[in-house]
A protein has these predicted regions:
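Concave beta-strand-loop units of leucine-rich repeat
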Residues: 1-8, 22-34, 44-63, 74-85, ...
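Recurring C-terminal helix/loop segment of individual leucine-rich repeat
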Residues: 10-17, 34-40, 65-69, 87-91, ...
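Extracellular/mature segments of secreted proteins
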Residues: 269-273
Length: 374
């Protein structure tokens, strides 16, 4: 019970006779045990709930959440308790609902046989002060192949390695606060993303002139099997990322955002096989900004349904960069912002929407083949 005067319960060993539970197992705050040992013989449940996202559980002694024999959950796992440090489900293979964990004390997170999550997979370690938390340094879900919903892993402040070696298809990927010390990010088999794919570093802006994003990740292991990202593919704020993944198999994007990839040595961005397709209510946009520099951006010649925003020297007035060579002949909307001393030359012929060029004083731009701006 959650009542203030409820009798405390510290031992659930008597429940070891249970093999299946059709409904939900709900752990109330009157339970003061350190683990769930009495549930270790259960193979199937409707769901497991310890707290909610809006009302965290206050079981002050519960440190380990494990059900060692559990193979199948027909509903959700929801664990929202900042005391939980260890998570272990040795035999769990499928979750027909969501898996949601919120704990700022996480030290280990083990799902060695999990293959399928029908809805969302969402792990966060945000502290009560709103800062990234947890002591866990490595997260690897070795057999996971499909997440129908959102895959989110965020605010794990000490994470060094994040690996999903067999993941092939996902509803969306939301890694929106990748830790600054992360060194390994591995998604080698990922092929289909039915929404957005966000790889965004945590970011600390000290003042107007200095800032810190992830300063360890030099290469993303994988994404070379990507064929479809129906939403926007975003890679952002990785200070020492040396190269982009090989996207030679990529056929469809809803949009592309590359932001503040300051040391990326790739100079040619080849998107020649990519069809940009509207996703939900969003029209396709290619946005390459804040010091992310390419000498050539190769696309299909007809980009009349796509907008593009380029700002290759967008860092605090920098004049260092390269004006990219563009091969398309038509574009929907085109915006270019640069402080570089050279005057760019654009060879495209038609802009079907708006064209905006932002340059410093006494700086120009040339578009000798431009026929019309509608």
């Amino acid at each position: 019970s959650d009542a203030e005067d409820a009798e405390e319960l510290s031992d659930i060993a008597a429940l070891k006779i249970l093999k299946e539970v059709e409904g939900n197992i709900i752990i109330r705050k009157s339970y003061v045990g350190q683990d769930l040992t009495g549930l270790d013989n259960i193979t199937s449940i409707g769901g497991l709930q310890i707290g909610t996202e809006t009302a965290f559980a206050t079981n002050s002694k519960l440190q380990m959440v494990s059900m060692r024999s559990l193979q199948h959950i027909t509903g959700d796992i929801v664990v929202c308790n900042n005391q939980v440090a260890y998570v272990q489900f040795d035999n769990l293979e499928t979750i027909d609902g969501n898996i949601i964990f919120r704990t700022s004390s996480l030290q280990s997170f083990e799902f060695p046989k999990l293959t399928t999550v029908v809805k969302d997979f969402d792990l966060q370690c945000l502290t009560s002060d709103g800062e990234p938390g947890g002591e866990i340094t490595s997260l690897r879900i070795p057999e996971l192949t499909k997440v129908n919903g959102r895959l989110g892993v965020n605010n794990l402040g000490k994470m060094i390695s994040l690996e999903f070696p067999k993941l092939q298809e996902v509803g969306s990927v939301d890694f929106a606060s990748i830790p600054i010390p992360l060194e390994t990010l591995s998604l080698p088999e990922l092929s289909v993303v039915n929404g957005d794919l966000n790889l965004v570093s945590s970011y600390i802006a000290s003042d107007a002139f200095t800032s810190t994003g992830n300063n360890k990740l030099q290469e993303i292991d994988g994404l070379s099997n990507l064929s479809i990202v129906k939403g926007t593919l975003t890679i952002s704020k990785f200070q020492v990322l040396k190269k982009l993944p090989d996207w030679s198999k990529l056929e469809q994007l809803g949009g592309l955002t590359l932001l503040r990839l300051l040391e990326c040595s790739d100079r040619i961005l080849d998107l020649s096989k990519v069809n940009f397709v509207p996703f939900e209510d969003n029209e396709p946009l290619i946005s390459i900004t804040d010091g992310t520099i390419f000498s050539k951006i190769i696309t299909k010649e007809d980009m009349s349904q796509v907008s593009m925003f380029l700002a290759p020297s967008g860092i605090t007035g920098s004049s260092v960069g390269i004006d990219p060579e563009l091969n398309f002949k038509s574009i929907k909307n085109f915006k270019y912002s640069s402080n570089m001393t050279t005057d760019p030359v654009f060879q495209f012929e038609r802009v079907y929407g708006n064209m905006e060029i932002i340059r410093g004083s006494k700086k120009g731009v040339s578009a000798p083949n431009l026929v019309s701006v509608d």
